[in-house]
A protein has these predicted regions:
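N-terminal, positively charged/glycine-rich alpha-helical extensions of SAM-dependent methyltransferases
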Residues: 1-28
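Conserved alpha-helix/loop element of class I SAM-dependent methyltransferases that forms part
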Residues: 36-56
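Conserved class I S-adenosyl-L-methionine
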Residues: 58-66
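Class I SAM-dependent methyltransferase SAM/SAH-binding core
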Residues: 69-120
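A short acidic, Gly/Pro-enriched loop at the edge of an enzyme's catalytic core
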Residues: 119-130
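A short SAM/SAH-binding and catalytic strip from SAM-dependent methyltransferases
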Residues: 130-141
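Helix-to-beta-strand junctions that scaffold the AdoMet/dcAdoMet cofactor pocket
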Residues: 140-141, 154-156
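S-adenosyl-L-methionine-dependent methyltransferase catalytic module, highlighting the catalytic core
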Residues: 144-145, 149, 159-330
Length: 335
């Protein structure tokens, strides 16, 4: 296993890593670095997560690694060896470039980047001591399948840590997310903003999801007119291409229009990727148990007294109240 670095040495290495690529998508992400959040706040968070999950001198898997910032921090601060996985090629390109730049500057960061769906990658069962996922599972196509795969990849006694703030119990976050969904589904201006300001490579061909659904329905050669297609496109929000095709056939056969899911309808019809789900932490806890995990613990994101004292409280109303004050939640689960 790699050596754990002191905070100052790790800080230097991480700054070199973060600025180690001029990938267009990464440059947009990096605009928040040092402005919306500080590197010291980030390092404190990673150290706290290493302590919470026992991620010290371990072999870890990060699911949905993005540009690998957390993976690099887990390796440098915790002495961990990390396999960092993301489904988006643009993300893994950025990770690879940052690792190469950091290495050229003398930083040997124990991160291996792999592109693909965690459910499809050829990884040996029981080969990881821990699995980490931060701000990623809200995009996953099939959470039950992902949790089952993670359970398979962990060794007995291994720990999974999920950190996320896409929390439907937080009123402000929920309303802001629903507003964003409406823009992503309907607005050409928003699609152009994604190309320009968010991820220029990933969103190069972005269009409103409703437009994509209308194109899919129109391509099926039915006798539906433009108004009927528009209504069906609205009703199939949250579906992928195969589901849209099946729903269209059902409607043409005389069945009622489908009803989009309340908290998971902003979805790319072609890739199946969710722009973002509004997650239910209590539902996720139950899904982890159903996937075979033990000792599943749900925690809120407060780390100061008095709210910190309520971590571990099993009362759903108390935790829902806490989540409405701050959306961040953490789930730990053992194999």
């Amino acid at each position: 296993m790699p050596n754990r670095l002191g905070r100052d040495e790790a800080r230097t290495a991480l700054i070199d890593y973060v600025y180690g690529s001029d990938h267009p998508d990464l440059m947009v992400y990096r605009a928040d670095f040092g402005t919306k959040f500080s590197i010291d706040w980030w390092l404190d968070g990673i150290m706290a997560r290493c302590g919470l999950a026992g991620f010290l001198d371990k072999r870890l898997l990060e699911v949905g690694c993005g540009f690998g910032w957390d993976a690099a921090a887990l390796a440098l601060l915790g002495g961990n060896s990390v396999v960092a996985v993301d489904i988006l090629p643009s993300m893994i390109d950025g990770v690879s470039e940052c690792l190469a730049t950091a290495k050229a500057k003398g930083h040997d960061i124990a991160v291996e980047a792999q592109q693909g769906d965690i459910c499809d990658l050829d990884l040996p069962p029981g080969s990881f001591d821990g699995i980490y996922s931060s701000e990623a599972i809200e995009h996953v196509h099939d959470l039950a399948a992902m949790f089952a795969r993670c359970s398979e990849l962990l060794r007995p006694g291994g720990t999974m840590l999920i950190v996320n703030d896409s929390n439907r119990y937080n009123t402000a976050f929920r309303e802001a997310t629903l507003a964003m969904w409406r823009l992503r589904d309907q607005s050409w201006e928003h699609a152009e903003w994604l190309k320009r300001e968010v991820r220029p490579v990933e969103h190069a061909d972005a269009e409103p999801f409703a437009v994509t659904r209308e194109k899919i329905i129109a391509s099926l050669g039915t006798e539906l007119d433009a108004e009927q297609i528009a209504r069906l496109a609205a009703a199939t929000a949250g579906m992928n291409r195969a589901q849209i095709e099946a729903a269209t056939a059902a409607v043409v056969a005389g069945q009622a229009l489908p009803v989009p899911p309340e908290f998971a309808w902003c979805r790319n019809p072609e890739t199946g990727e969710y722009a973002e789900r509004l997650l239910d932490p209590f539902e996720l806890r139950d899904m982890l148990r159903a996937a075979g995990f033990k000792c599943v613990r749900l925690r809120h994101g407060f780390n100061r007294i008095p709210f910190r004292l309520l971590n571990g409280v099993k009362s759903k109303p108390i935790n829902a109240w806490l989540f409405n004050r701050r959306p961040l939640f953490m789930l730990t689960a053992q194999r």
